[in-house]
From Swiss-Prot:
Gene, per the UniProt record: rps16
One Pfam short name: Ribosomal_S16
GO cellular component: chloroplast; mitochondrion; small ribosomal subunit
A biological process term (GO) from this entry: mitochondrial translation
Lineage: Eukaryota, Viridiplantae, Streptophyta, Embryophyta, Tracheophyta
GO MF annotations in UniProt: structural constituent of ribosome
UniProt name for this protein: Small ribosomal subunit protein bS16c
Amino acid sequence: MIKLRLKRCGRKQRAVYQIVAIDVRSPREGKALRKVGFYDPIKNQTDLNVRAILYFLEKGAQPTGTVQDILKKAEIDKELRPNQTKFN
């Protein structure tokens, strides 16, 4: 199963995160299938590849709680087709 989750980058006391599509059995810092976005919690900046995110969501990927909140804030959940299920 594929999940959209955060992968930690940056340095000590200055974390930034990549939003990646990754297999659930992989470790947090493991090899990702594809990078689909970027999140900086200190500056509160996000950069999302909407096309790639929608592709993985249509294929059945599940976002983690934090990624789900980021996607809702960016209003990506409104771009899902009506017949597609919403986030859990």
